[in-house]
């Protein structure tokens, strides 16, 4: 159980260390740096969705024969729909955006910025939680090392996210500690979501392939709806694409080497 605890907390550690950059760096991150970090995070999330979630889901559904794709397809679709639903009911503001999404709200821009990253982190916490739930249930295709690889990959891409959220908060006039706390707070949802997912999945172990693909669908939604537009906005640049490839390769290597 100690390994599970650390596996759930490592992603939050990545966010916390990234948010701590606010104490050592001044001003906003350069636009090209933001693009690079966002592209890297996108690559990690896409690779994690495929290698750590969808592939195990398909492997566990193999006894269904020609219908083995059904749990993965259904779970993936429901995961996308779930994030789409949250996107419409939670007021939030994406990085470098002028207008907020979701219902009208009197919340401060800084609060809605934190909500945007928190919304982004929900599927990451679910992904870690559902993989560890599979490990605890002894499901085939899921190992403790593979689960730790996913946690490490999420933590790596959480580091730049922590900086991306805390530094604009400080640049907007917020104090260093409050900015750090804002970045940290956006990542707290991950271990909370992971624990809730473990508890829920443990009740319906036969549906694990659906839960795995659900988390994958939610993560892909975040990448397509939020991260890819952010890394491609403004003047043309290859930084986002190259960083995406690097992030994908890093996560793929982690999953294969440790999984």
Regions found by a protein language model. Give the residues of each.
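Intrinsically disordered, metal-sensing/regulatory segments
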Residues: 1-259
């Amino acid at each position: 159980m100690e390994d599970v605890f650390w596996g759930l907390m490592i992603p939050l550690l990545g966010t916390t260390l990234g948010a701590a950059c606010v104490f050592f760096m001044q001003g906003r991150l350069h636009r090209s740096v933001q693009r690079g970090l966002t592209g890297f995070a996108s690559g990690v999330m896409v690779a994690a969705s495929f290698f750590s979630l969808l592939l195990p889901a398909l492997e566990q559904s193999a006894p269904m024969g020609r219908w083995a794709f059904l749990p993965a397809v259904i779970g993936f679709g429901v995961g996308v729909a779930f994030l789409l639903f949250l996107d419409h009911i939670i007021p939030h503001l994406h990085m470098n955006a002028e207008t907020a999404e979701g219902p009208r709200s009197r919340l401060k821009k800084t609060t809605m910025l934190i909500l945007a990253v928190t919304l982004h982190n929900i599927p990451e916490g679910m992904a870690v939680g559902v993989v560890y739930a599979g490990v605890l249930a002894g499901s085939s295709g899921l190992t403790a090392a593979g689960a730790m690889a996913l946690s490490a990959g999420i933590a790596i891409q959480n580091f730049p996210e922590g900086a991306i959220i805390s530094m604009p908060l400080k640049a907007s006039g917020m104090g260093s500690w409050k900015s750090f706390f804002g970045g940290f707070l956006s990542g707290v949802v991950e271990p909370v979501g992971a624990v809730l997912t473990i508890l829920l999945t443990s009740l319906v172990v036969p549906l694990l392939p659906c839960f795995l693909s659900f988390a994958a669908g939610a993560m892909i939604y975040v990448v397509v709806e939020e991260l890819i537009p952010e890394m491609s906005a403004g003047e043309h640049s290859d930084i986002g694409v190259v960083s995406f490839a690097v992030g994908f390769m890093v996560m793929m290597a982690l999953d294969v080497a440790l999984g």
